[in-house]
Amino acid sequence: MADKILRAKRKQFINSVSIGTINGLLDELLEKRVLNQEEMDKIKLANITAMDKARDLCDHVSKKGPQASQIFITYICNEDCYLAGILELQSAPSAETFVATEDSKGGHPSSSETKEEQNKEDGTFPGLTGTLKFCPLEKAQKLWKENPSEIYPIMNTTTRTRLALIICNTEFQHLSPRVGAQVDLREMKLLLEDLGYTVKVKENLTALEMVKEVKEFAACPEHKTSDSTFLVFMSHGIQEGICGTTYSNEVSDILKVDTIFQMMNTLKCPSLKDKPKVIIIQACRGEKQGVVLLKDSVRDSEEDFLTDAIFEDDGIKKAHIEKDFIAFCSSTPDNVSWRHPVRGSLFIESLIKHMKEYAWSCDLEDIFRKVRFSFEQPEFRLQMPTADRVTLTKRFYLFPGH
């Protein structure tokens, strides 16, 4: 019986499952009515670590009997073949499976298929309700075998301790509130958790408080057993940097982007040496609209490009100290970024949508290129996301589900 199998595999499941698979299981079990909304919320909110969530989830389902347990097992076999291999599970058709799905003649589609169809029917925004596509084990192995020296290695899910930091400022003493930013915060946190990161969230900080949080994050011992990290900053911004909550024309409460790089570089954060460090910034970088009226001829002076800044004496040294970074900003320098009061930021929405859709098959820089392409012919306001200070030396595949 499936419930007995699940109990027998309990310890292995707790030690091996990723947070992405846990979240997928919760969605599947809610959809199949194995769990109700209250049970799902309790598992998510009452447990801090992924292992605690896994333990609570496994115990909940096994107590509900063989039918519920079979749905649990079938999902793992279909959506996380790597975990299924570790647990030695098989999703062979059985009477138990069909009892749970008899109200659908064609059988239930996967949770991702169901959600995609639901999005088309109810008009919800893609990217907010989409599902992260997992990378099949065969695809991950193929990518790795083809170019092992050109891809950043990932650590085993059972031992790695990935961390991510989100700083989101929504309320300010002298600036307007960032209406809709809570959507960005919620969706970005869920995405990073699905990708296997434990997410630290900090809200409404001054520049000094942001510096303190980044320094503490850089010093976290978990980075030693992690293969990468994400830092996400969402706030008002100006050309000089990211606004703290007390910023005004009289109070220069600004976190410079350069300061973030300095706090996370090899000298200050040696635990992340040779590991990808991704910085996402949703903030204006000026007050310009990011659009010009085109004319048939434009004079470009060669001198405009041959500035001293390109030929810094210590460039080689910086490349070694500041390595394996990529920053993705919501707009080009000097220009504004746009935010919808219901949907959230256009940049964050597009980024999450493309990460969910393509992370299983594309490296991060390719995903960022797809995000930029989505802004090439804008439907609403004009802005163009840009990658800054890219020192990645290899391709960074996220391999969702692994």
Curated annotation (Swiss-Prot):
Changing residue 122 to N: In C71 mutant; abolished cleavage and ability to generate caspase-1 subunits; abolished ability to process inflammatory cytokine interleukin-1 beta (IL1B) and ability to induce programmed cell death. Its main location: cytoplasm. Residues 1-91 form the CARD domain. The keyword Phosphoprotein applies. The keyword Hydrolase applies. High level expression seen in spleen and lung, low level expression seen in brain, heart, liver, kidney, testis and skeletal muscle. The modification Phosphoserine is found at residue 301. It is found in: Cytoplasm; Cell membrane. One of its GO terms (molecular function) is peptidase activity. Transmembrane segments: none annotated. Residues 1-118, 297-314 form a propeptide. Residues 113-123 have a biased composition (Basic and acidic residues). Coiled coil: none annotated. InterPro entries: CARD, Caspase-like_dom_sf, Caspase_cys_AS, Caspase_his_AS, DEATH-like_dom_sf, Pept_C14, Pept_C14_caspase, Pept_C14_p10. The modification Omega-N-methylarginine is found at residue 343. Disruption phenotype: Mutants are resitant to vaccinia virus (VACV) but not vesicular somatitis virus (VSV) infection. They show lower viral loads in the lungs compared to wild type mice, they produce higher levels of type I IFN, IL6 and RSAD2/Viperin after VCAV INFECTION. PANTHER family: CASPASE RECRUITMENT DOMAIN-CONTAINING PROTEIN 18 (PTHR47901), CASPASE-1 (PTHR47901:SF3). Heterotetramer that consists of two anti-parallel arranged heterodimers, each one formed by a 20 kDa (Caspase-1 subunit p20) and a 10 kDa (Caspase-1 subunit p10) subunit. May be a component of the inflammasome, a protein complex which also includes PYCARD, CARD8 and NLRP2 and whose function would be the activation of pro-inflammatory caspases. Component of the AIM2 PANoptosome complex, a multiprotein complex that drives inflammatory cell death (PANoptosis). Both the p10 and p20 subunits interact with MEFV. Interacts with CARD17P/INCA and CARD18. Belongs to the peptidase C14A family. This is Caspase-1.
